[in-house]
Amino acid sequence: YKRGVTVQDAAGTNEFQDVQIRWGHKFSDKLAMKVNFGYLTGTDWIANSEKDKLNRSVFPGDYNHDGINIYGDEVATNIYGVAQAMIGLGLLPAGAEALVPSEVVSRTGYNETDMAEPDATSKKADWGVYYRPIDGSNLEVSYVGKWGTGKTLYQGINRYAIKNFLMTQHKLEVTNDNWFARAYVVEDDAGDSYDMTFAAINVNRRWKPDLNWFAEYVGGIVNGQLAGMNITQAHALARQTADTGRWLPGSSEFEANLAEVIQDPDLTSGAKFTDNSKFYHLDYGYNFDDKWDWAEVQVGGSVRSYSLNSGGTIFTDVDGPIEYQETGFYAQMIHREVDDRLAVTAALRYDESEYFSGQFSPRTVISYTAGEYKNLNFRVSLQTGFRTPTTQDLFIGLDAGQARLVGSAEGNPDRYVRDYGISAAGQALGVPATVTVTGADAYNNSYEASSVQAFAAAGDPSLLKVAEVDYVKPEKMQSMEFGFRGKLSRTFTVDAAVYRN
């Protein structure tokens, strides 16, 4: 054990400061402890691109503008359909739809700097207690805890303001010369984090519902056309009309409503996401080195149990936490011959998840060291591996605005259920005013998005192409490698490998 204190204080030109403190102490030959603490604060990178996500156009020239770092403009509709609905309700005279182009228009959004502050902070600490109860033995019992919280901006499928999040880990470990066992739990809390896209969408909707905004936009288009304006001028008048009285960033109305929206976890009216997920993990292993002379043998395994708890804001866990388990076992043997110049390694691992059949992943490596000074090494290896889908691959149920992400674990698509309103044009074709869609419909009863866009443009049903969506499954990999490493002189070393994955 070593004892001491380390203090570090760093700063940068972009209002950045980083402080690190470390402390360790050996109380006796049996007991020691260490503590680390870190604090970071600064100004985060400001994302301010207003270019459209798809065609990189610049607002306001694009009426259906979805800016990269503009939020709330994801809400869009075809204003010709709105005009038809208004005529049906008697809000526009018959024939007025002739003055309204069949174009998709998006609502006016807010910039990222309006939705979140760019300052970033990080506070973290860890501590450990280490105890060796038996004199002359390497048996050690230890406890390590980790804690972290902070604030930052995060880019995922949407842009998120991560605020006051909390993550903790607690680990208990017992080790000896030939074996070990460790168990730990990791838990997180999303704190006051929120989705900036839905924050902007729902601030807009609090000020003026989508139906009202698009109806006023259509009214502006009609008035502009009747006044002799060209279509570009009419669009400008329409947006000005629909945005009249809009809450501006910095106003008391905007700030008060934003504060309420980001504390509401219902994405139809708010933007907060909750996550109190955790997982428990156990590792264990035994080394038979001192038992057998003919080979080095190790065996072990692991168990991991998940508890996903986002209240339906991230996963499909509206009715309660989603729990599942993964297990794994491994064995490895190394046999040496020819004065330890030849080494043969054989390993086998078996992993199983509740949602997938068990997977074997064998590995074999043969290496030979040549040369009088053992300075030439040749190796050949055959390896297999796989990756089990992540918790999000399996259980996500996230509304991302213009897209919905639905994991494909057994039963997960059926748990994702949403009701959608149908446009007047759709209702004219006999479709009900609202339809209920599940994630299973997306997997089993859907068309490719590009073919739907082609159909919408041409009106030809033959352009529709049924989507064939595969359910997620473990990724598998096989690798073969031939390698050589040799020191050919005091100043020249060759390290080369040929492999195929």
Where is each model-derived feature located?
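Membrane-embedded beta-barrel scaffold of Gram-negative outer-membrane proteins
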Residues: 411-501
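Outer-membrane beta-barrel translocator/receptor signature
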Residues: 1-53, 121-123, 139
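Short sequence motifs at beta-strands and strand-loop junctions characteristic
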Residues: 12-15, 107-109, 113-122, 162-166, ...
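Face-selective signature of the C-terminal outer-membrane beta-barrel domain
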Residues: 171-356, 495
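Transmembrane beta-strands of outer-membrane beta-barrel pores
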Residues: 9-15, 39-43, 145-151, 176-178, ...
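Residues on the lipid-exposed face of transmembrane beta-strands in outer-membrane beta-barrel proteins
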Residues: 21-25, 125-131, 170-176, 282-288, ...
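Transmembrane beta-strands of outer-membrane beta-barrel proteins
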Residues: 3-7, 33-37, 139-143, 170-172, ...
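Surface-exposed extracellular loop regions of Gram-negative outer-membrane beta-barrel proteins
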Residues: 122-168, 297-306, 320-367
